[in-house]
Amino acid sequence: MSAEILDGKSLALKIKEELKKEVQDLKNQGINPCLAVVLVGENKSSQKYVSFKEKTCKELDIQSLVFKLPENTEETSLIKLIDELNENSQVNGILIQLPLPKHLNQNKVLERINPFKDVDGFTPFCLGRLLIDSPLFIPCTPKGIIRMLDEYKINLEGKQAVVIGRSIIVGKPLSLLLLKRNATVTMCHSKTINLQDITKKADILCVAIGREKFITSNMIKKGAVVIDIGINVTASGKVVGDVNFDDVKEKASYITPVPGGVGPMTIAMLMENAIYAAKLQKRVVK
């Protein structure tokens, strides 16, 4: 029997409809949410993600400001722009599209963002708040994954959760959120030995390694919940995940497709964070 599909696309549409009403309520109070997105360089994937974010802002009537900077932008220039956006009271959220060109210090750049405008949740302040179970902004992809698991009433308490990938974007914050739900979490990465022995014990397997169709059915146990966070483009131009979907779906109980799983939820959570930032700064919430 094939796995049930965790339909992130449909859930994201439902969430966006609710957010659209929230935006209208804020506008009725004279509050106009505004998200600033900074893109440095010519990375094609980054350009595509930024266009998705612009499009979704437009759908929800959130103002978006996109700053496209050349590949050779100096760090001082980027920091100066962030400082200006921090000071601009009309801008509620600031997002630096990652990855940055290699000559830029990602940590230094992210640290410069005002934590109360850090809608990606990547500043040391926001990550620290997440660590002590008092989050301000939760990184969008992990937040979307947990929301999806909740929607499908997938219980995490006492379950063995395996996360492959240790970035601050997905792996580390997702592990913290799973721990918060009382899962027993194992984090794996490129140096993990005997990976298959670990993945086969997972009740919940979350994969974010950037390797096309890497996870196969012989690497999971029957009935596992499989969350595919990978986005890879094949030689033919097809978008696929880190999981061999057609193979694994015959053994898993639930699985996310790529596209249409985690990706749409990430964008929806970004919009939710942007709206929350506007409320926070205008003191609609505390």
From Swiss-Prot:
Catalyzes the oxidation of 5,10-methylenetetrahydrofolate to 5,10-methenyltetrahydrofolate and then the hydrolysis of 5,10-methenyltetrahydrofolate to 10-formyltetrahydrofolate. Its EC number is 1.5.1.5, 3.5.4.9. One of its GO terms (molecular function) is methylenetetrahydrofolate dehydrogenase (NADP+) activity. Pfam families: THF_DHG_CYH, THF_DHG_CYH_C. Pathway: One-carbon metabolism; tetrahydrofolate interconversion. GO terms for biological process: L-histidine biosynthetic process; methionine biosynthetic process; purine nucleotide biosynthetic process; tetrahydrofolate interconversion. It catalyses: (6R)-5,10-methylene-5,6,7,8-tetrahydrofolate + NADP(+) = (6R)-5,10-methenyltetrahydrofolate + NADPH; (6R)-5,10-methenyltetrahydrofolate + H2O = (6R)-10-formyltetrahydrofolate + H(+). Homodimer. NADP(+) binds at residues 165-167, 190, 231. This is Bifunctional protein FolD. Keywords: Amino-acid biosynthesis, Histidine biosynthesis, Hydrolase, Methionine biosynthesis, Multifunctional enzyme, NADP, One-carbon metabolism, Oxidoreductase, Purine biosynthesis. Belongs to the tetrahydrofolate dehydrogenase/cyclohydrolase family. NCBIfam families: PRK10792.1 (NF008058), PRK14186.1 (NF010783). GO terms for cellular component: cytosol.
